């Protein structure tokens, strides 16, 4: 990984920690000191960060080309991503949000001695809704890395339930709907419902890998977009 990647991987952690050190020292202000705006310096810092992030995207995240989900249509609005597909009489909806989906502590040592810093990946929780008629079968899932298989991912069902289908754009689940934890289920049901049933609908290990790749790419683009919005805001 090149220097730009290292900057990207560490910037959200290393810069924050260095700021804490500086803020810990007492600050003495001269009564006669001329008040200077921080804006020019902040603009320069934002430009440097945006340039480093764009270089990382070019080197490691396929630039502006986002991964694609086989069989799904993708729509997004700000931090939210929605995947939809038809499966016979079923309407399948997958929703995830990339806010706070990158664990910046994962893969970093206390001492910054690594020659190659890991590129942080986004692993957002996601929901799956399978709608037939006036009902929908819903799953809340977490992404998990596969042990001893780098860059491979699986999902864990955290919660599942059956709810009325969404009507007139209202996707809220009524509070009286019973939901069960995915941690406590018969092993046979786990294999049939959580694994094979979802695999038949395209929600398998390949889907998980694509979701992580897409979310990482999309979260990164949202972060760069946020920096650019801040730069434009302070320049007004």
Curated annotation (Swiss-Prot):
Record's keyword annotation contains 4Fe-4S: no
FT transit peptide: 1-36
UniProt keyword list: Mitochondrion, Transit peptide
Superkingdom classification of source: Eukaryota
GO biological process, one term: cytosolic ribosome assembly
Subcellular localization(s) per the UniProt record: Mitochondrion matrix
Keyword Transit peptide: yes
GO CC annotation, single: mitochondrial matrix
Family annotation (PANTHER family): COMPLEMENT COMPONENT 1, COMPLEMENT COMPONENT 1 Q SUBCOMPONENT-BINDING PROTEIN, MITOCHONDRIAL
Record-stated family: Belongs to the MAM33 family.
Name of the protein this chain belongs to: Conserved regulator of innate immunity protein 3
Species the sequence originates in: Caenorhabditis elegans
Phylogenetic lineage: Eukaryota, Metazoa, Ecdysozoa, Nematoda, Chromadorea
């Amino acid at each position: 990984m090149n220097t730009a990647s290292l900057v990207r991987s560490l910037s959200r952690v290393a810069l924050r920690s260095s700021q804490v050190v500086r803020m810990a020292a007492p600050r003495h202000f001269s009564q006669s000191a001329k008040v200077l705006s921080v804006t020019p310096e902040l603009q320069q810092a934002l430009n440097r960060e945006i340039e480093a992030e764009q270089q990382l995207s070019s080197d490691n995240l396929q630039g502006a080309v986002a991964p694609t989900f086989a069989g799904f249509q993708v729509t997004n609005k700000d931090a939210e991503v929605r995947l939809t597909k038809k499966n016979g009489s079923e309407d399948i909806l997958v929703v995830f949000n990339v806010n706070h989906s990158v664990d910046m502590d994962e893969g970093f040592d206390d001492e910054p001695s690594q020659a190659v810093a890991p590129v942080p990946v986004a692993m957002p929780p996601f929901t799956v809704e399978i709608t037939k008629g006036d009902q929908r079968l819903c799953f809340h899932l977490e992404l998990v890395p596969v042990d001893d298989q780098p860059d491979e991912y699986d999902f864990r069902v955290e919660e599942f339930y059956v709810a009325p289908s969404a009507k007139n754009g209202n996707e809220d689940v009524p509070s009286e709907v019973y939901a069960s934890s995915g941690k406590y289920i018969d092993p046979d049901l786990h294999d049939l419902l959580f694994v094979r049933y979802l695999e038949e609908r395209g929600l398998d290990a390949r889907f998980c890998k694509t979701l992580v790749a897409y979310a990482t790419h999309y979260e990164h683009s949202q972060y760069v977009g946020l920096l650019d919005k801040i730069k434009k805001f302070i320049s007004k």
